Structure formats: C-alpha cells, structure tokens
C-alpha cells in the first residue's frame, strides 16, 4: 500500500495528542508500522525556532506580530517541514502522522484573524504544491470546552490567549471547510474520552480498508 499522510486538527484542548496515539495504535493493528510524526509549526530545527517566535509571547518583546507576518511565519515553518521531512518520508514509503497542517492556517488565520481566504489559498498552492493530507481528523470542541482543558495544562501561548470570539470564528471556519472536503472527517470531541477514541478507531479502520478495496 502506498504511504499516506494523516493529519489531526482541532482547537486547543481538543485532544490531538491522545488522538495521535489512537491513530498510531490503530494503524499498527492494521499492519502499518513505518511511520514518522510531525507537528506544526515545528518538526525541524528551523521550524521549531519559527514556532518559538510565533507562539512565545515574549519572543519579540513588546513588538506586535502583524497578522500577515504571522501567516508568513507559519508558512515558512510549514514549507521547511514539507520539503525536508514530509515529502522525503512519503517518497520513501513511510506514513506521516501530523499534528496540524494547512487546515489550521485556513481556520485560525482565515477564520479567526479574518485574513482573505483567496490570499491564503493562493499562498498555500504556491508554496506547498500538491502536498495535501490524505485523511484529516478534525476534533470538534467548543472554545469553552477546549480552552478549559488547555488552561488546566498550564501557561497559555500567544494564540491560546486569544478571545472566545476568535476561537468561535476559527471553529466556524473549521466546520465550513470540513463540510466542503470529503477527506476531512469530523469527530465530536466533546464526548467521553472512550467514545472519542472509538470514533477515531472506526474512522481510521474503515478508511484504510477502503484503500485496500
């Protein structure tokens, strides 16, 4: 079976780390063991430095990161990851399991920040080319639920400190994009943990079986 790219998406506190573990466990049970794991922003030395710049509220002192500068920083990190990790892995027959990818930018910057969607799509197509996830699991939670979980983990980063209105706009854009793309599967992540895990297992298992059909 040709290698695939699976991405896990969602608001802060949606449970992406747990979801990744379930995806890996499910794939292994299906006989798929050659995998690499990525996170965005990050995943390479350069991308991790960009991650610190864009997420650490103290990284640039009192200087405000403009919305468009933020977009370009995310894309710089993403391109580095795609070119140096994701593309080589897929070409080598290795499956890639990602914590976030371009859907995050379309939702957070396009929805939350209100940046022109055409500009974001044009930038995506120009710098990422044909690299797209084969399957995206969008873990849907309300900002109230997600941020409560995130705050329980400790100090919030620059994005996590945004307003509920910002996250409501981000969630709305996520749902809008998920409704338009059959490769994006929405999981109700407000359910009890075991129910969420079962939904992920079922989705991944059925999807892989369809690949074999």
Curated annotation (Swiss-Prot):
Gene Ontology BP term (one): dTDP biosynthetic process
Keyword Nucleotide-binding applies: yes
Keywords assigned: ATP-binding, Kinase, Nucleotide biosynthesis, Nucleotide-binding, Transferase
Coiled coil: none
Gene3D superfamilies from the UniProt entry: P-loop containing nucleotide triphosphate hydrolases
Pfam families recorded: Thymidylate_kin
EC number: 2.7.4.9
GO molecular function, one term: dTMP kinase activity
Enzyme class, first EC level, given as a word: transferase
Amino acids binding ATP: 10-17
GO cellular component: cytosol
Disulfide partners: none
Reactions accelerated catalytically: dTMP + ATP = dTDP + ADP
Role: Phosphorylation of dTMP to form dTDP in both de novo and salvage pathways of dTTP synthesis.
Family to which the UniProt record says this protein belongs: Belongs to the thymidylate kinase family.
Protein known as: Thymidylate kinase
Originating organism: Escherichia coli O6:H1 (strain CFT073 / ATCC 700928 / UPEC)
Annotated gene: tmk
């Amino acid at each position: 079976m040709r290698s695939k790219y699976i991405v896990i998406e969602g608001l802060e506190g949606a449970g992406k780390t747990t979801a990744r573990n379930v995806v890996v466990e499910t794939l292994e049970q299906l006989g798929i063991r050659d995998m690499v794991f990525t996170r965005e922003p990050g995943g390479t030395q350069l991308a991790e430095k960009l991650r610190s710049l864009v997420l650490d509220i103290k990284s640039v002192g009192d200087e405000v990161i403009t919305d468009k500068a933020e977009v370009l920083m995310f894309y710089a990190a993403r391109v580095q990851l795609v070119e140096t990790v994701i593309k080589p892995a897929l070409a080598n027959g290795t499956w890639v399991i990602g914590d976030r990818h371009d859907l995050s930018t379309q939702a957070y910057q396009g929805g939350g920040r209100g940046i022109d969607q055409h500009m974001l799509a044009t930038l995506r197509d120009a710098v990422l080319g044909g690299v797209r996830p084969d399957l995206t699991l969008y873990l849907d939670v309300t900002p109230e639920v997600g941020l409560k979980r995130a705050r329980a983990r400790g100090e919030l980063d620059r994005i996590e400190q945004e307003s509920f209105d910002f996250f409501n706009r981000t969630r709305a854009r996520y749902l809008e994009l998920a409704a338009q793309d059959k490769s994006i599967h929405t999981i109700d992540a407000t359910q009890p943990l075991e129910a969420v895990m079962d939904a992920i297992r079922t989705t991944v298992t059925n999807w892989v079986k369809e690949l074999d059909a």
